[in-house]
C-alpha cells in the first residue's frame, strides 16, 4: 500500500547490523562502535539497514539506556535479542558454545553463526490457518482432494476430535511443504551454485562443495510459520461457540464460512467458488448453462440474498468478533497457539535437507500475519 511504499522504498536487501552481545570467550562485545551505530540510527531514522542489539547479563547499563533512547524515537529500532535464550537454543541445534556466542541476525530476525552457516531462512511460508480451512472442507479445495480426509466436520461431537483433525491436517501439509522445499534445494545445488559466496563460508573450500551442496559447516532449512494469532482465534471460536456454549451448530458455522458470512466474495474468490460448484455439478451429471454460471458467480459476489440467512450469518460473525482474542494474556488461547507452534516445530525437526542438515521452524507472529 501507499504507506509501505513510502516507508520501505527502494530495493531493500534486508541487511542487518548487529551490535552488543559477547565474543567467543563469553566477554562482553559492546564497544564505542556499538554506541555510534545507535547514534547513527537516531540521526537517519531509516528502516534500513535493520539494526539489532544483543542483550545479556553482562550488557553495560549505559548501552541499555542508549538503546532505549533509540527506541523512544519511534523509528522501530533497534530489535532486541536475548543471548540468555538464543545461545542455548543454537546449541540445541548442534552449534558449539563458542560459535553460538558469536551469532548474528540474518535478514529479519533469524540468528545464525556468520561465515559458517547456510541457514536458508524463509525457505517457505506456512499458513497456520490453512489446515483449519481444510478441516472444514475435509481436505478438499476447489473441488480437488488436496489433503487427507479427516472426516465430515458436522459429525464431530467434541473439540478434541476437531482439534485432532486440525493437527492431522497440519502434519500432512508440513510434509508436502518439506518435499517441495527439498526439491528446490536439490535444484539449487545442481543449477544455480554460488561459488563466490561459498569461498567465504567455512568448510566449503575444504569440502570442495558450494553452500548449496552442503559445503557449509552448519546447514539448516527454516520455513516460516505465520498467521498463528488468527489460527488460535479460529480454534478458540470453534471451541467456545460450537462445543462449549453451543450457540452455533457446526453446520451453521461451515455454511457461514462458505458464504463469507453473507458479505460476498472477492472477484477471484467468487470465480474459484463458481468453478468448484460447476465441477461438482458436472460430477453429479448435471449440466450448467452460461447464464446459470453467471448467476452463481453473481451470488458469490453479492453475498447471501435470503434475509433470514444473512441475518444469521451476521449474528455468527458478531459473536466471533466479540470473543476474547490471542495476545491479551488469556491462558487458554495462548496455550492453543503454543501447542500448534510446538507441533509445527517438532514435526519439522523430523526432516532432513539434501545438504545433510536439519529443518528448524521459524514463526512470524507479526511480520507476515
Question: Where in this protein do the model-derived segments appear?
Answer:
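Conserved catalytic cores of very large enzyme subunits
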Residues: 1-369
